[in-house]
Design a protein with these regions (language model features):
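Aromatic- and glycine-enriched pocket-lining scaffold segments that form the walls
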Residues: 1-45
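Outer-membrane beta-barrel pore domains
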Residues: 32, 36-189
Length: 189
């Protein structure tokens, strides 16, 4: 990979020097049986060059990598599918302590009728602490709990519509009221 896993897809085009400090990615998974699959992922690489503006003189993006490690589980039986993932990430920042973050989710999907499904997801992002200039420790962002529920319909194998409601709860401080309703029509090929 030529950029960190937390970067936007629009930052992925190749440029001269992109592989000077590459991002390494490892993924292992094992199908326990027809119903269970377990996996793990590991990634380590530098910030994207667009983040280099605040890096001290004599350093470059390769001196401040992001490390990501996670596990995932998938289970399916009959009309029910369950997915779960948990990830830890650490971003080595040039001007503050290392930034750590834990995130996880559990999702269940139920096939109500052929083509018709419903789903629910619970997720959290738990931010680590950094020391301010006076040495006092603070969380570097507010923890987030997210609940999603929705459903959809597959008209064909590759043509579908779905709707989702996402409720976001930020812990501590002002609640930004950033809940979402999303309706999507998709066509895969």
């Amino acid at each position: 990979m030529n950029t960190a896993p937390a970067s936007w897809v629009f930052q992925w085009p190749l440029h001269a020097g992109d592989f000077r400090d590459p991002n390494y990615y490892l993924r292992l998974s094992y199908a326990v049986d027809a119903s269970w699959t377990v996996g793990t992922s590991l990634s380590r690489g530098p910030y994207d060059r667009q983040d280099a503006a605040g890096i001290p003189a004599g350093k470059d993006t390769g001196d401040f990598p992001q490390t990501l490690a996670g596990v995932d589980v998938q289970y399916a039986i009959g009309a029910v599918e369950v997915f779960a993932e948990a990830y830890w990430t650490q971003i080595q920042a040039p001007l503050v302590d290392n930034l750590e973050l834990w995130s996880w989710y559990v999702e269940a999907k139920y096939k109500i009728l052929p083509g018709l499904f419903g789903a629910v997801r619970l997720a959290q992002m738990i931010f680590g602490s950094i020391d301010d200039a006076s040495g006092v420790s603070h969380q570097w962002d507010r923890n987030l709990t997210r609940v999603e529920f929705g459903g959809g319909y597959f008209f064909t194998r590759n043509f579908f519509t779905k709707a989702t409601v996402q409720l976001n709860y930020t812990m501590g401080g002002r609640e930004p009221h950033d809940n979402l309703f999303v309706w999507q029509v998709g066509l895969g090929f």
